């Protein structure tokens, strides 16, 4: 369902949140003028109930969309976009951290409700990982995959590239931020994987460069986040 509680405009409140990110001393302003964020916090509270209130249900689509876009706006501050440094002045904001934790704690509980934990406990972890590895190497031909391979036309391909460009044009791999720590063989292998994805230090060989070339061939905008509004909440998550 795309219905929302009467009087709450998630799209408008997302834009108000974006404006908050550019405030000087955001934490101080929230403390001194709490009414500034009352509507936003009320919308987040309502969205949390709509999206994650019942772990047995998929939740409200627009609520998911709103919450994931809020999280995206917060988390993107951890990456450098080669723009004005003033855009990062609130990257260490305690208020933003509180909002993120509030949303993610409810989201994680809802996600856990979608998983049969007892069944997972009975599985052989190593064998399960091997099975997942094999499935990644040789994925089954589902109805959706068959459509993409056999029936997708040029315009459909352009749409697919535009939607996935939110990820394809940006290097946001979590791997690059978890490789620190004691040296070990697993870390060494992960570094090899990371270097391959980053073109071994050559811009022309980076995966994002190849993706941009594919988009250019389809006459699409290659600006990072250029098609942000096309992205479904599942992609943001």
Model-found features: residue ranges?
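Non-heme di-metal
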Residues: 1-237
């Amino acid at each position: 369902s795309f219905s929302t509680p009467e009087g709450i405009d998630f799209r408008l409140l997302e834009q108000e949140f974006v404006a908050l990110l550019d405030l000087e001393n955001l934490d101080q302003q929230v403390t001194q003028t709490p009414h500034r964020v009352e509507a936003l916090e009320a919308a987040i509270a309502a969205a949390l109930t709509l999206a994650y209130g019942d772990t047995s249900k998929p939740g409200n689509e627009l609520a998911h969309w709103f919450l994931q876009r809020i999280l995206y706006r917060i988390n993107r501050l951890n990456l450098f976009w080669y723009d004005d440094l003033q855009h990062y002045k609130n990257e260490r904001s305690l208020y933003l951290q509180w909002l993120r934790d509030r949303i993610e704690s409810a989201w994680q509980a809802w996600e856990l409700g979608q998983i049969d934990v007892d069944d997972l406990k009975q599985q052989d972890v190593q064998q399960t990982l091997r099975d997942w590895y094999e499935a990644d190497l040789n994925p089954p031909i589902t109805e959706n995959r068959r459509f993409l391979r056999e029936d997708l036309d040029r315009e459909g391909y352009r749409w697919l590239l535009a939607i996935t460009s939110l990820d394809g044009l940006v290097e946001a791999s979590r791997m690059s931020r978890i490789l620190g720590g004691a040296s070990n063989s697993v870390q060494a292998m992960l570094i090899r994987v990371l270097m391959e994805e980053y073109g071994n230090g050559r811009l022309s060989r980076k995966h994002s460069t190849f993706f941009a070339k594919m988009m250019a061939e389809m006459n699409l905008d290659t600006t990072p986040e250029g098609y942000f509004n096309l992205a479904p909440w599942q992609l943001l998550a």
